[in-house]
Amino acid sequence: EEVVHTALNLLNRDVESVFSTRIIVTPESKKGMIIVGTIGQSDLIDKAGVDLSPIKNKKEAFLLAVSSTGKLVIAGSDKRGTAYGVMELSRLIGVSPWEWWADATPAKKEIFQLPASYRNVQSPSVEYRGIFINDEDWGLTPWSWQTYEPSDVKGQIGPKTHERIFELLLRLRANTFWPAMHGCSVPFYFTPGNKEVADKFGIFIGTSHCEPMMRNTNGEWKRDGVGEYDYVHNSAHVLSFWEQRVKEVAGLDNLYTLGMRGVHDGAMNGAKTIEEQKAVLTKVLKDQRDLLTKYVNKDVTQVPQVFIPYKEVLDVYHAGLQVPDEVTLMWCDDNYGYIRHFPTAEERARKGGNGVYYHISYWGRPHDYLWLGTAHPSLV
C-alpha cells in the first residue's frame, strides 16, 4: 500500500537525520533486522513469531515487538496501522512529528537499542481524526501560492503544500482533512495532484458543514453550478452538481458530509421555517445516499458519512429530523468553545457514533478570535 511506502521513506529520511546513515531495504527476511508488514498481506509478518492477536480485526492498530530471533517486528492491522507503526519507530529514535513545521531538528545519535522484551501495541479510540483548514485568507493561502509553492494561479494551495500538511497528519496519526474553502483559495479538487497526495499519505478527505458531497460549494458552484443553490426550486441542478464530484472521487478514501446549508455558512435557500427545512433535508439525505449507493458502494451503510448540525441545522435536528443510524453525528461548539448539544444515551448507541467540530479560533461577525487564543485549554 502506498501509505506504507510513504512512511518507510519518511523513516529512512529520519534515520539519516539521526544516525547519518540510511536503512538498507531487502526482501530477504534472513538479512533484515526490521520486518514491516500488514496482517494478512505479508507472509513475513504472519510468520514472524510474534503474537499478533492484540491488533487483529482492529482498525489502524499497530504492534512493535522484538521477536525471538532479535528482529524488530512492525505489524499493522491495515495500511494505516502499519504506517503508524513505522512512524512510531521514528518517534522512538527521537524525531518529533513537528520536525519540519517547528524546525525541531532531532539530536544526533550513534546507537539505539530496544530490550528483548519490548512490546508496543496501540490503536485509536477515535476513528476519524483530523483538521479543517479554515480562515486561511491571510495565513496558509498567501504563504502557499506566493512563497512555499509559487504559482501563477492566485490562491492555489497545491500538492507540495498539502504534502507537508499530510506528512504532519501522518506523523501525528491523524487520518482526516477538510481542505481550505474560503473564496480566496482555489478549491482543493481544482488543483492537479492534490487528491493524489492525500492518497499517498493515507488521508480521508472530507468537507465542512456547508460543503456536502465533497463539493466546495463556496468556490465551485459559481463555476459548475446552474441557477440558484436551492433544493426547493432547483434540485435537479444541485443534485447533478453533487453527482459530478461523487463520480470523480468514488474510488478514493472519503468521509462524505451529508445535508445542506447555503452556499457559504448560511441557512439554506428556499425553505424558511423549521418544518420546511426539515422536509427539504429529509429529501436531501435520501437523494445524497442514493448517489453514494449508485457510485461508491451498493451497501451504503459501509460508506463513511457524517451529518453536522451546525448553527441553525441543530434546531432542525431537534425538531425531529431523522438521520440514518450509520451516519456519524458531529456535534458543534457555539464558536466560542462550548458544545451546544451533548449526545443522549440513544445517540451514543448509534452505529455511526458521534464526533466533535470544534473551533480553536473563530472568525465571524460581529467579532472574531483569530489573534488571541480565547478557548481555554480546559474547554478543549
Regions found by a protein language model. Name each.
Residues 170, 175-178, 185-188, 193, ...:
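Structured mid-domain segments that build the active-site/substrate or prosthetic-cofactor binding neighborhood
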Residues 1-123:
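Contiguous, structured surface segment used for ligand recognition
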Residues 96-154, 160-180, 352-355:
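An acidic-aromatic substrate-binding cleft motif
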Residues 73-76, 134-159, 175-185, 220-238, ...:
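The substrate-binding groove and active-site-proximal loops of carbohydrate-active enzymes
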Residues 129-133, 176-179, 205-208, 256-258, ...:
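Hydrophobic faces of well-ordered beta-strands that scaffold small-molecule active sites
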Residues 68-105, 188-215, 219-247:
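Hydrophobic or amphipathic alpha-helical targeting/insertion segments
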Residues 15, 78, 131, 173, ...:
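Conserved, mostly hydrophobic/aromatic
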Residues 23-25, 107-114, 182, 189-190, ...:
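Gly/Pro-rich turn-and-neighbor structural signature
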